[in-house]
Amino acid sequence: MELVFIRHGFSEWNAKNLFTGWRDVNLTERGIEEAKSAGKKLLEAGFEFDIAFTSVLTRAIKTCNIVLEESNQLWIPQVKNWRLNERHYGALQGLDKKATAEQYGDEQVHIWRRSYDISPPDLDPQDPHSAHNDRRYAHLPSDVVPDAENLKITLERVLPFWEDQIAPALLAGKRVLVTAHGNSLRALAKHIEGISDADIMDLEIPTGQPLVYKLDDNLKVVEKYYL
């Protein structure tokens, strides 16, 4: 069975070198072109999907739509879910990465960004940009909405969606596209590939490039490659 991951195309805050997380920013022209290229590659390689999963953030949704349009599959069902959102970067969201390193030191920022189980400082729930004040999360219990996450917590958030939605779709024989974010996809990759806590820190997923998994009947990875 086939599973394809695509990290959203290059975003406005990727271009500005800002911590993004759950902040909702748009694609750049480069990001749009990356998504178009991904869709064309999938079309040329003969990939057909039965269902697509994405987050509730604009950059991932738009990437999904563009990829499906370019591959002539915009009509297939799409499921949007908050569990596929990017890792929440807490109080770092909206800050310049270079300036943050100058303020707190390279080592501290590296720990916040790359350690598996250490989170950055929480974002104040009363902050106007907090997810607690965003109506797309109004249906969630307050204690479920994060104020900051590390990759371990991100995996704990993403995994129920894998088990409840993505894995059952694959086991039912559906061909699945997941268009999401660097860290939510890294979390899924860690789970399905069995990557260790230490090794996952070295895994990078580039923007806008289809990552193909061939899986056996037990959802074990048989083959993995980029188009």
Swiss-Prot record:
Catalytic activity, as annotated: (2R)-2-phosphoglycerate = (2R)-3-phosphoglycerate
Alphabetized UniProt keyword annotations: Gluconeogenesis, Glycolysis, Isomerase
Top EC class of this enzyme: isomerase
One Pfam match: His_Phos_1
Alphabetized CDD domains for the sequence: HP_PGM_like
GO molecular function: phosphoglycerate mutase activity
Positions that bind substrate: 7-14, 20-21, 59, 86-89, 97, 113-114, 182-183
EC number: 5.4.2.11
SMART domains: PGAM
Homology family: Belongs to the phosphoglycerate mutase family. BPG-dependent PGAM subfamily.
Record's function text: Catalyzes the interconversion of 2-phosphoglycerate and 3-phosphoglycerate.
Protein's UniProt name: 2,3-bisphosphoglycerate-dependent phosphoglycerate mutase
Native organism: Pasteurella multocida (strain Pm70)
